[in-house]
């Protein structure tokens, strides 16, 4: 699932075709779809490579038992065909410890909706008003190993239905931090059936049961707010 590399000017400027789309407005054959890779190297201005890990850990605060904890918001970006935009990333310490997940990230002082659309713009270049977000549709509690430590995260998931034009004009890796550039590898559109096929071949997707969840969210959310607990400590 390797992706074509994307130059810095493409990541911060005008058009990069995401897999499965074409400029004429149609959909490319899914079997020919390939992800769009993230340009490696420095992130935002002022973030030296030696401080990348520390800057990532600054987003977390000790929980009651001392485990690093943060709140996060995520956006399930769905195109008119019901495909979801996912990000492929890996651990700081182990490139083979990798998985696919939805757009989003840690929250600052802002609310979940505001944080979700901020993360959406930073990671994809797509700007959306918080009022366009549907949900929350999923509340996820997660405890996992990352950067050689156990961390804990509570996530709120929203749906954003994008137009074909928004999907085609997305700019993967638009404004990533240095930590994100180091650990994020690829953006790609996925159909639920493709997710199931990839899982059968050994790929990991979060949240657990993502393909089935998408089918409850598209073409219309069934109105149920689901709760998921994931533990990935190995």
Regions found by a protein language model. Give the residues of each.
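Nudix hydrolase/Nudix homology domain
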Residues: 2, 7, 18, 93, ...
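Active-site-adjacent beta-strand/loop module that shapes the phosphate/pyrophosphate-binding cleft
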Residues: 140-173, 188
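Acidic, metal-coordinating catalytic segment for phosphate/diphosphate chemistry
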Residues: 2-10, 46-80
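Intrinsically disordered, low-complexity terminal tails and inter-domain linkers enriched
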Residues: 1-52
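Short, P/G- and charge-enriched loop/turn segments at secondary-structure junctions
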Residues: 56-65, 144-148, 174-177
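A short coil-to-beta-strand element that immediately follows conserved catalytic motifs
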Residues: 127-138
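Short connector loops at helix/strand junctions that flank enzyme active sites
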Residues: 70, 97-102, 151-155, 182
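Conserved Nudix-box catalytic region and its N-terminal flanking loop in Nudix hydrolases
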Residues: 83-123, 127
């Amino acid at each position: 699932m390797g992706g074509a590399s994307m130059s810095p000017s493409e990541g911060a400027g005008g058009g990069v075709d995401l897999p499965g789309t074409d400029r004429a407005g149609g959909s490319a054959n899914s079997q020919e779809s390939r992800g769009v890779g993230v340009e490696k190297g420095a992130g935002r201005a002022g973030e030296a490579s030696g401080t990348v890990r520390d800057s990532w850990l600054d987003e977390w605060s000790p929980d009651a038992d001392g485990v690093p904890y943060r709140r996060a918001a995520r956006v399930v970006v769905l195109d008119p065909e019901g495909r979801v935009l996912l990000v492929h990333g890996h651990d700081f310490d182990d490139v083979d410890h990798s998985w696919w997940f939805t757009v989003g990230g840690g929250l600052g002082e802002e609310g979940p909706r505001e944080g979700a659309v901020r993360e959406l713009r930073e990671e994809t270049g797509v700007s959306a008003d918080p009022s366009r977000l549907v949900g929350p549709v999923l509340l996820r509690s997660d405890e996992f190993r990352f950067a050689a430590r156990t961390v804990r995260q509570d996530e709120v998931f929203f749906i954003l239905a994008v137009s074909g034009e928004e999907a085609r004009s997305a700019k993967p890796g638009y404004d990533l931090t240095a930590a994100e550039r180091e650990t994020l590898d690829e953006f790609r559109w996925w159909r639920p059936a493709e997710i199931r096929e990839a899982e059968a071949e050994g790929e990991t997707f979060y949240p657990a049961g993502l393909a089935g969840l998408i089918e409850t969210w598209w073409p219309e959310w069934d109105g149920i707010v689901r709760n998921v607990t994931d533990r990935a400590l190995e």
